[in-house]
A protein has these predicted regions:
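Polytopic transmembrane helical bundles with strong interfacial aromatic enrichment
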Residues: 1-417
Length: 417
């Protein structure tokens, strides 16, 4: 098999699976902040129980998501040495900031939040969760800064065949960044809202004891999902203008701007196929179709009145069975964004075939199989653990459980008089 194809398949596999963990993390942490803030402000134990229950699911996903991220980093280092050599001075800056500032701070805040239950004041404990959320969004921001540079290189100059950063501010004002970041963040909120609504619907279908608790989380999830899908659609369609101006070939080569750019590339780099594969447009089309389908969540909101959504029960099944849709949509969107810039890894600068490492096809195939099996195992483990802990209900989650009182000795020794 072709080494380049294997490398691209490996990139698609590792980044797509990791991205599923990322959107769950971003979506749930936002809802957790709201629930814990409600507990701190009102003192209502219902909000504490909801925070502990959903926080436990968040921690499971976060821990296994770190493992998938490490696999993705190995994949980058092994397969794309040409990318690191040519654009590492530019591309590496936002990635370094994301790792050193955002990720390490996020992990530190999360660890203190996990072990700070019943040890820290409510306000301090809530501030730690705010720190987790802010640094999580900071991580997403810097990752999108790096990816947007690959989509539309700005603020650089090429010296001795290597790209060097000349304008850091240009990275932050990249036309490819703003709407894409809003699209990703709103997609994460959609995933978090749908996950919360679907799990709550499952408990309400089964008529588990915590009816009032899951009734509340169903409402939170549905309202979040409805608002988020509107944001997703807005940011998504708003991207067409900026993307069309900086990447004319993304939506095909049959327009004057694309033909002029392809002619320029042919002169500079020689003859070749400079239009992206049809997979980009197919993925985009299916993503839009799923997006409009998820927009029907708005039709469920009136049924929240007097709990008609629970009385009818059929809408609960729709919510539960619709849970995979936002996950499929985010993967299709990511594929469309990445495949749409082909045959470039850095648009108009470095072709994908020039970025791949000089690795033999058998070795590349071996790493593809190994990483795919490892990531598949992590993904299945994550969903099994999430399903198991979600099904147990909110009676007594392990997260935030009060410490057991010290046990009395079985035979107390007589006191000396």
């Amino acid at each position: 098999m072709d080494t380049l194809l294997l490398a691209r398949l490996q990139f698609a596999t590792t980044t797509s699976i990791h991205f599923l963990f990322v959107v769950v993390t971003l979506g749930l942490v936002t809802l957790l902040v709201g629930m814990q803030a409600a507990w701190v402000l009102t003192g209502n134990p219902k909000w504490e129980r909801l925070t502990r229950y959903w926080g436990q699911l968040y921690v499971i996903n976060y821990v296994l998501g770190i493992a998938t991220g490490l696999v993705m980093e190995f994949q980058f280092g092994l397969n794309w040495s040409g990318l690191s050599r040519y654009v590492g001075n530019v591309f590496g800056a936002p990635l370094a900031i994301e790792t050193l500032v955002a990720f390490f701070l996020e992990s530190t805040f999360l660890g203190m939040w996990i072990f700070g239950w019943h040890r820290l004041g409510k306000g301090v404990h809530l501030a730690l969760l705010w720190g987790v959320a802010i640094t999580a969004y900071a991580s997403a921001f810097w990752i999108m800064v790096a990816n947007s540079w690959l989509q539309n290189p700005v603020g650089y100059e090429v010296r001795d065949g290597i790209a060097h950063l000349t304008d850091f501010g240009a990275l932050l004002t990249n036309p490819s960044l703003g709407m894409a970041l809003g699209h990703v963040v709103s997609a994460a909120l959609l995933v978090g809202g749908m996950l919360m609504a679907a799990v709550s619907a499952g408990h309400l279908i089964r008529r588990t004891p915590d009816f009032a608790l899951f009734r509340t989380s169903l409402r939170i999830g549905l309202i979040t999902a409805a608002l988020a899908i509107t944001m997703v659609q807005g940011f998504g369609f708003a991207q067409f203008g900026p993307v069309g101006s900086v990447q004319p070939t993304k939506f095909g080569g049959d327009n004057p701007e694309s033909r002029a750019l392809i002619a320029e590339w042919t002169t500079r780099f020689g003859p070749g196929d400079y239009t992206p594969p049809a997979l980009a447009s197919v993925g985009l089309g299916f993503m839009i179709l799923i997006g409009f389908t998820l927009g029907c969540v708005w039709l469920l909101l009136p049924l929240l009145y007097r709990d008609w959504i629970i009385r009818l029960r059929f809408p609960l099944w729709l919510i539960l069975l619709g849970l995979p849709l936002p996950f499929v949509a985010v993967i299709l969107g990511w594929i469309s964004r990445e495949v749409g810039r082909q045959p470039w890894v850095a648009y108009g600068l470095l072709r994908t075939e020039q970025a791949v490492s000089p690795v033999s096809a058998p070795l590349m195939l071996t790493s593809l199989i190994g990483f795919s099996l490892l990531l598949g195992t992590l993904a299945v483990t994550n969903w099994v653990l999430l399903a198991r802990h979600a099904r147990r209900g909110a009676a007594d989650p392990a997260l935030g459980r009060p410490p057991a009182p010290p046990s009395e000795p079985a035979h107390p020794e007589p006191a000396l008089i």
